[in-house]
Amino acid sequence: MSNTQNPNIQCSFCGKSQDDVKKMIAGSDVYICNECIELSTRILEEELKEEQDSEMLEVKTPKEMFDHLNEYVIGQEKAKRALAVAVYNHYKRINFTASKIAEDIELQKSNILLIGPTGSGKTFLAQTLAKSLNVPFAIADATSLTEAGYVGEDVENILLKLLQASDFNIERAERGIIYIDEIDKIAKKSENVSITRDVSGEGVQQALLKIIEGTVASVPPQGGRKHPNQEMIQIDTKNILFIVGGAFDGIEEIVKQRLGEKIIGFGANNKKLSDEDSYMQEIIAEDIQKFGLIPEFIGRLPIVAALERLTEEDLIQILTEPKNALIKQYKQLLLFDNVELEFKDGALMAIAKKAIERKTGARGLRSIIEEVMMDIMFEVPSHEEITKVIITEAVVDGKAEPEMIREADKK
């Protein structure tokens, strides 16, 4: 192409002559003026910006995420703060990469390890965050996973669950969140090694390492084991946030030993619950390694948040206060039948006590309420005269029948 000075030549795009513009560029039987070039450049720049903006995720601030978690999750203030900051930084990192600003700086992703007893809210925290961010979310159980060559589930099947949660939209899946539960159950052990199933744990940790740190994985769309000539879906895990959780029963003893506070003999059972929780807050990478996770695996989980054991008061709040509180749900279910449901304070305390006795935490609350409500929910729809049901402590303990108020009783 060259600049031409022939005044009779017109721009092939806007029709302006050489005299009307500053420059006219000639090609093979085609001409373009400087104004059309400038306009084309602006259009291209705007389209490029739109593409970059489409790759950018709208991320809530840590405070906004924390406030959202508070609407659904009772207690666990430290864990909620740690999660909010870690998730914010993770998606900010993705946006930073998409914007191609300061390409010489590589931001590494920060996967998260949640440590806390059963029923303390580990899974629910991750699930609630993913929902608030509108990103695909999948849950996997570490105990079902094995390394290649053993009987069990390939680690790539975790990614299949995320793909399914995103309706096989690969781009969305590659920005999703995966929660792997019971990660403490794959802590390496030296005994009971099987030739058909990897129960030592280390092999599974090694297999998980690659997808957690970031790799392009081949996922069988139908699940199961990989087979030769099988069609695979390629998914890049570098922007998938992995949150792993476990109870890590006994790790507080490892912390006590490190801190030089090991209690020997009869007095070992005299430690208060709050003391156990305080030891959990002191966990460092060294303790997790002694428990059985390999250093390379721990290194891919730089954010560690410890959840506290839920108290009776916490469980009562969980029953009644969050937006999706169980008591609110059951009240609404009976309200559909025009029946008011009331739980006395003693009933709520009894439900919380049962959950603590069963060591199920918040996870076990629904099953306890179901036991109490099953006969009520069976009978009430058949009795239009019932207007109110009252649940007392004795009802929860199985020592009395619920009080049913009928229309005739009010007259």
Swiss-Prot record:
Residues 1-52 form the ClpX-type ZB domain. Zn(2+) binds at C11, C14, C33, C36. One of its GO terms (biological process) is proteolysis involved in protein catabolic process. It comes from the Bacteria. Pfam families: AAA_2, ClpB_D2-small, zf-C4_ClpX. Keywords: ATP-binding, Chaperone, Metal-binding, Nucleotide-binding, Zinc. GO terms for molecular function: ATP binding; ATP hydrolysis activity; ATP-dependent protein folding chaperone; protein dimerization activity; unfolded protein binding; zinc ion binding. The keyword Iron-sulfur does not apply. Coiled coil: none annotated. ATP binds at P117, T118, G119, S120, G121, K122, T123, F124. Belongs to the ClpX chaperone family. ATP-dependent specificity component of the Clp protease. It directs the protease to specific substrates. Can perform chaperone functions in the absence of ClpP. Component of the ClpX-ClpP complex. Forms a hexameric ring that, in the presence of ATP, binds to fourteen ClpP subunits assembled into a disk-like structure with a central cavity, resembling the structure of eukaryotic proteasomes. This is ATP-dependent Clp protease ATP-binding subunit ClpX. The lineage of its organism: Bacteria, Bacillati, Bacillota, Bacilli, Lactobacillales.
